Amino acid sequence: MKLLVKKLREDAALPFYATSGASGLDLFCVDDVVVIRPFERVLVSTGIAIELPEGYEAQIRPRSGLALKKGVTVLNSPGTIDHDYRGEIKVILINLSDKEVIIEKGERIAQMVIVPVLKVEVVEAKELSNTQRQDGGFGSTGMK
């Protein structure tokens, strides 16, 4: 499958797989410098737009190295890019550390995973089938 990528800025970097076994395509900051203060969130530009085939979405996910080394992660993870969106891909980053973080142009800021989407038919129901769990959630099955 091919992913069409349009550079919206000449200096934008095309996403790529860092290794042959990588699931996600690395996305890059196109801005000269982005400063993120502690607990601040910012919208970071990639300078690219994509065209996904119908039946697929792109999920924007954090990079583990950025989270571990700088305390920065993708806020709405995973972010969803629908197949009919043609605007610039931007990434919402949040600095969870107690120090100011600088993201430089060309730095990898997130990864993009292309996944199939299943469409369902929504049917209103008066009752749902019983299960052992029922409405238990938020740790109801135990912590250990």
Curated annotation (Swiss-Prot):
Required cofactor names: Mg(2+)
Transmembrane domains' residue ranges: none
Chain sites annotated for binding substrate: 63-65, 76, 80-82, 90
InterPro entries for the chain: dUTPase, dUTPase-like, dUTPase-like_sf, dUTPase_trimeric
Gene Ontology MF term list: dUTP diphosphatase activity; magnesium ion binding
EC number: 3.6.1.23
Disulfide bonds: none
The keyword Metal-binding is annotated on this UniProt entry: yes
Hydrolase as UniProt keyword: yes
Reaction(s) this enzyme catalyzes, per UniProt: dUTP + H2O = dUMP + diphosphate + H(+)
Pathway participation: Pyrimidine metabolism; dUMP biosynthesis; dUMP from dCTP (dUTP route): step 2/2
Gene Ontology BP annotations: dUMP biosynthetic process; dUTP catabolic process
Keyword terms: Hydrolase, Magnesium, Metal-binding, Nucleotide metabolism
Function: This enzyme is involved in nucleotide metabolism: it produces dUMP, the immediate precursor of thymidine nucleotides and it decreases the intracellular concentration of dUTP so that uracil cannot be incorporated into DNA.
Protein family per UniProt: Belongs to the dUTPase family.
This protein's name: Deoxyuridine 5'-triphosphate nucleotidohydrolase
